[in-house]
Amino acid sequence: MQKLLLITGIILCVSISTTAQKSRVISANNLLESENYQEAKEAIDLAVINTKTANWPRTYLVKGLLCQNAFEAGFEKEDEKKTKLYPDQLYLAYDSYEKALELDAKKRIHASVETQYYELANSFQKLGQRHYLRREYNQALKAFELALLVSRSPLISVKVDTSLIYNTAMAAYESRSWDKAVQYLTGLDKDSYSPETSLLLQKAYMAVGDSISGELVLNDGVGKYDYNQTIVLQLVDHYVASGRWEEAFVLMDSAIVHQPDNYYFPWTRGLLYQNLEQYELAIEDLQQASKLAPEEVPIFYNLGICYYNMGVEIDKKALQIRSNKVYRATRAEAKKSFEKAVVWFEKAYEANPGDQPTILKLYQLYSRLDMTEKRDSMKQFIR
């Protein structure tokens, strides 16, 4: 009987001791509800290291609540007394909740964690946005990925907002985390999120040395986004950089058919012809572009360059001609090209009188054509 009383006493003492320790967790919860975060921290930190409560799910639930609630209370005003109770406080909130779920075999607190996860995902998004705006891209990526992780938790299983995936992709891109950038941008590109995602995905592939996949993305984007101008021009640049001129022209021909009112396309094809010194074809396209965009001054300059270069080529041919009659006729032909160049350069100068390349070309042409008065007036503007 005495032995039984002894055992009962021991059990009672253990029970009282355990209850006392658990009351510390309850006290911490009460303190955080009254926004006494520092005192709540002291109480919960003791509970975490006490053997009686170290494996109690509610201990970690309360720690998660403390970390999250204090962080959210201080976030807008950047109150570090609230947001830095612990290092990486919001991440510790998530880890604490996950620990609580792991210990909660009977799932008694799952509903409580579920309630917190909706707001926790939102808090990670806000944290990521703050880091991103401050160009702290690695930290932004970390926060956005946690927002995704929480949003995809089986506890809440909400449909992830594509804007969150986009933000995560952008943080990965800006932080030069290329593999992750490819991962997130690929998902967006499959959903036809925007032309920008195709362009960024192509650049991410190029950054990891996968030019084949990058080219496929742009090719797909041309059709997907109805010959989006930026995608088309990026693909043309890719073809030209790899010496695939024929494919560049095929693409531009198709783009002009699909978007006949887009002056960038004949302008670009004209520049391709100009680069290959096929000046007559270049002039034809550039004039068409100028009709579509009569205020686009750089086209005037490009037309001037074509006529100028044609004149130079004809002049070179004249030097090889022995017949005086043919020589004079060839020089006259060159002069006509130079005079046409003057017309376009003067239009460019009239629209943008401070442009040095235009001023220099006019000075050269006035000199070549013996237009002394105009040459002298232009000389003063050369810097």
PLM regions: where:
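TPR alpha-solenoid repeat register
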Residues: 57-59, 110, 156-157, 164, ...
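Short coil/linker segments at helix-helix boundaries
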Residues: 66-135, 151-162, 309-344
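Short coil turns that delineate tetratricopeptide repeat
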Residues: 52-54, 105, 152, 159, ...
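Canonical positions in the second alpha-helix
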Residues: 47, 100, 147, 187-188, ...
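Canonical tetratricopeptide repeat
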Residues: 62, 116, 126, 160-161, ...
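Start-of-domain marker
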Residues: 21-75, 83-85
